Amino acid sequence: MAQRLLLTDLLYSQGFGTRRICAGLVQQGLVQMDTGHGLVCVRETDTAVDVVQGMPFMVQGILWQYHTKAYVLLHKPAGTECSHKPSAWPSVYSLLPTPLRQRPAKTGLQGVQAVGRLDQDTTGMLLLSDDGQFIHRMSSPKHHVPKVYELETQDAMHASVVEKLLQGVVLNDDPQPVKAAACALTGSHSMALTLTEGKYHQVKRMLAAAGHKVVRLHRSQVGDMVLDHTLAPGQWRWLSGEELKALTRKTQS
């Protein structure tokens, strides 16, 4: 269903700055809206727009989509931190366009936030959103959202390692054994491991408890959604409506 918004309010909601800055963008002819006959420059700040999810518009020559809430997928490269205040490595948020980082929030931090964290040297699938409920559902252990990791170890592994991880290993901060939801060797030094919780450095610590050092770690899947191989490290894209429905269904099942 379409929602009617003033153009300045639309731009503000999508993270293009204060309403004063948004009004300036309009007045300078830097905003183009789809009028049904293609994108047309709009200069009147009091213009009302009927907005729908995914509606295209252009700001300063860059094409955007309107989304009430932002749900994006980032292919996290190595050497980046999942933090707004990184300690030693560039932030993953620096890979996102400014509007995604500036989307206004009624409470908490503005802009999209990572759904869980990946270590600086871990690559792969990272979801981000400004929907707090979505973030909670996807990251809370009680929802058991499976996450698949592909890893390589320094030394060769044997079938006994798989058995240990499936039966459960004890980490140094928790007497309760931690189990893999699924685990399979994919080579003498490689493995696919599925977890449904996200403890600190969990994959590396589980493998260490089983006697192996992880030298490469990549998250390839969250729920039923597999990382798109056409999305290069450092690139991002919007989640489709179908992908979002599939992810949220997983947390409700």
Please provide the spans of the model-predicted regions:
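RNA substrate-recognition surfaces in RNA-acting enzymes
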Residues: 36-52, 167-253
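Flexible glycine-/small-residue-rich
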Residues: 61, 74-76, 128-131, 153-155, ...
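A short, contiguous, amphipathic alpha-helix enriched in charged residues
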Residues: 84-103, 162-169
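Glycine/acidic-rich beta-strand-loop module
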Residues: 102-140
